[in-house]
Amino acid sequence: MKARGFKAKMRGFKIFSGSAHPAFGKEVSKHLGFPLSKAVIGKFSDGEINIQISESVRGKDIFIIQPTCVPVNDNLMELLVMVDALRRSSANSITAVLPYFGYARQDRKAAPRVPITAKMVANLMQEVGIERIITMDLHAGQIQGFFDVPVDNLYGSIVFRDYIRSKALKNPVIASPDVGGVTRARYFANQMGLDLIIVDKRREKANESEVMNIIGSAKERDVILVDDMIDTAGTICKAALALKEQGATSVMALGTHAVLSGNAIKRIKESALDEVVVTNSIPLVQKCDKITTLSVAPLFAEVIRRIYHNESVQSLFT
């Protein structure tokens, strides 16, 4: 996928990249054929973020690329400070391009006396002056409703779909690594025209280890686990082992966001997984032979172009 070149009227457009994922910003810029605008991003001696926009943005439509990944709080605050600087510099509109939306897992009250942090972050973004959000594979789709501004939640499945087809697997089947991810896995299975199986983990009694039940058959099949993010990798590694024990020929995991915290890389290396496929929505710090990274920068570039030209985004995914 390649964004078509900008027309002369794109003179009213500027694109900035924060420090969270500069390589992604450069790649999007390259696909757009439009240079990144400049800003000086620094910190005071006490850690406070300090930003100065290095060129005029008066009357311009601004797109800021900044996934709110690790360090989540610093990257989120940097985004907010940059938006404030742009708004006070008379930008016409400000769109936040968040390949990964941090705090998305705190989308409801799952226990007494806990916050709904995803809603609080949405409030902060709107209050500071963000007028549109472009993100991908939100952990909970209902987060779109936390905003009173347009939210374009892109589907990472578009790049996974092409990759899976290129593998020419003989007897593939889609799997959800847990019951909570069934809707996401079913969507991908429908896109691919494949069957769906589910890994259901249960603890039959207190203080007993989890039992992995497979709903459907994985025997002699190439299983493709589908999830929105891979954090500690515990769930997909346990699911892969259960699937191999049932007779799966191979097990591949697809995860849009490679959070990979803690011992995730070590778990993946030692697991029954044959391959883990992720996108570059988050910079991959550690390398692993089992991990394949697909770029979604061309997708984001084309979406930015379409939004600026008031063209349909949904048609990309149909």
Curated annotation (Swiss-Prot):
One Pfam family matching this protein: Pribosyl_synth
Gene Ontology biological-process annotations: 5-phosphoribose 1-diphosphate biosynthetic process; purine nucleotide biosynthetic process; ribonucleoside monophosphate biosynthetic process
UniProt KW keywords: ATP-binding, Cytoplasm, Kinase, Magnesium, Metal-binding, Nucleotide biosynthesis, Nucleotide-binding, Transferase
Catalytic residues identified in the record: 201
Gene3D superfamilies assigned to the protein according to its UniProt record, in alphabetical order: 3.40.50.2020
Function: Involved in the biosynthesis of the central metabolite phospho-alpha-D-ribosyl-1-pyrophosphate (PRPP) via the transfer of pyrophosphoryl group from ATP to 1-hydroxyl of ribose-5-phosphate (Rib-5-P).
HAMAP family for this protein: RibP_PPkinase_B
Record family assignment: Belongs to the ribose-phosphate pyrophosphokinase family. Class I subfamily.
Name recorded for this polypeptide: Ribose-phosphate pyrophosphokinase
